[in-house]
Amino acid sequence: MDKLNLYHELEQLLRMNSRYCMDDGRLLKNRIVEDALSIQPLLVKELLGNEKMKKAFFTDVEGVMVFDKIKFQRFVSDTQFLGGSYTMFKNKIGLANENGRFVSESREVVLSWPYKDCMLEGGQTKEDAKRNEVFWNETLAPDEVNRLTEPKVFSNFKRYDKEGEHQVEHLSDTENLIIKGNNLLALHSLKKKYAGQVKLIYIDPPYNTGSDEFGYNDSFNHSSWLTFMKNRLEAARMLLSDEGCIFVHIDHHELFYIGTLLDSIFGVENKVQVISVKTATPAGFKTVNPGPIDVTEYILFYTKHKNSFKFKKAYVPVGYNVNYNLVLDKNEDILKWTFTPIKDAMLQSLGFKTEKEAKDRYGDMWKTLKNQLIAQYAFNHADNVVSVRDPHKPTEKVKSLMKQSKEVGHVIAYEKEDGTVSYFYNGGALAFYSNKMQVIDGERCVTELLTDFWNHISWAGIAKEGGVKLKNGKKPEKLLKQIIEMTTNERDLVLDFHLGCGTTAAVAHKLKRRYIGVEQLDYGKNDSTIRLQNVINGDNTG
């Protein structure tokens, strides 16, 4: 059977399985390769049941059919599978070896460090308790590795509600869990029940700054941290649903290494963004820095399968945009629509004929007050306040309408196929201030779309949130609210296996999400369980 016919045969076979075919008919190539490399029984059974696939990708070894997953992976990765013009080079960009194979596929060039092929238990229970541990090699110490990865029995459960603490006789599937203990052991123990069910993972792991709580094997501190993170991220990925995502919060010390590690575990194709978060202002820094003052942390955002992930638009409050500087007076006849500068409209609304009258009335206050009054006027009259601007990537039709509007000197309306109407005036498109209005936290406000630079969340005064304190690294509840709302819906499952004082769980609880939190350090009176009890009792400090 020639290769092109085999491509077609395989494509038709895979399209019959909803796991590999989207609603629009496109095949999920990455998932097919992933299932092949992990020898997913469903895929192997499908292939084995087809005589042509059986002949192409299986070898009979004394009556046992052995699947050649590498041959299959190369076949599926070929540019001719699922279309594409012919080229001797592959249809993606990347570093390749002399044989033309990508280094990420051949694994001849990867991020390496001492003890990468080992497992680090990470048994530290107090922040200041330094600990030397053995790196268990997966080949040389399989029994110890199996001991760490085999499911453990959770014990000593207690249930908390508004009536207080209760003994647990039965756990339902909808329970929120706070697990006290080693997070590596906990992740592997959660697999049987929760594999493929978690919608969002957020973690704020030790930053490995040398002064934080990561206290393992100082001689190999960097390697210890990478091994520690790799072991846990690989286990966590198995818990994510196909529509799930992970946010890893970090600072600059390990940013580039954790990014490369996440690329290898979740796939470069599933990286969404690296978000920069402003966490402080220069005013509080008294030490002399060798460079710019460090006020930024980073959140790495990955999906399990980007094609399956459902992105939500998110908005953030902003101040008045001075480009919205005209007030539109609408008449029934669009040819008679007129425009007034917003400053003049604001003055008229206050009973002033000229700005000089306002200056005489308010004196030195006027310069500051004027801007505040214009912003307030725009907010109160958002349906009529507009900006004339150049659209982003206009179509030829839009370009023609803009040119026409400049020539005729009045507003032109254009109804699009979806029923919405666009307006053009003086060579530009009208943007209405009302389109920037959203309701956030119950208040109507001026907004813009969320970007990958987050400076809208205050980190001041968060020490008292939740009624607990954390010496280092406490995160604002509004930060977690932003992440949880943009990636999940009510009743979705959220996981944080570096729970700390419980911010993620507290916010998830308030937003009616289910959650699992894991923490092995003992924070005493500032423990996550204390915080969750406060939330149950109506805490509103976040």
Question: How should these model regions be labeled?
Answer:
Residues 222-226, 230, 255, 477-542:
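Conserved S-adenosyl-L-methionine
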Residues 123-124, 190, 211-216, 258-260, ...:
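Short, solvent-exposed loop/turn and secondary-structure capping segments
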Residues 160-192, 461-493, 499:
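Glycine-rich adenosyl-nucleotide cofactor-binding module
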Residues 84, 117-119, 305-466, 477:
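Active-site-adjacent helix-turn-beta-strand microarchitecture at beta-sheet edges
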Residues 184, 279-288, 420-442, 469-493:
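Flexible, glycine/threonine-enriched loop-and-boundary segments that flank and lead into catalytic domains
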Residues 165-169, 184, 190-245, 253, ...:
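SAM-dependent methyltransferase catalytic-core segment centered on the flexible catalytic loop
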Residues 229-232, 242-243, 247, 252-319:
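Signature of N6-adenine DNA methyltransferases within the class I
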Residues 1-199, 210-223, 390-400, 410-419:
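DnaQ-like (DEDDh/DEDDy) 3′-5′ exonuclease domain used for proofreading
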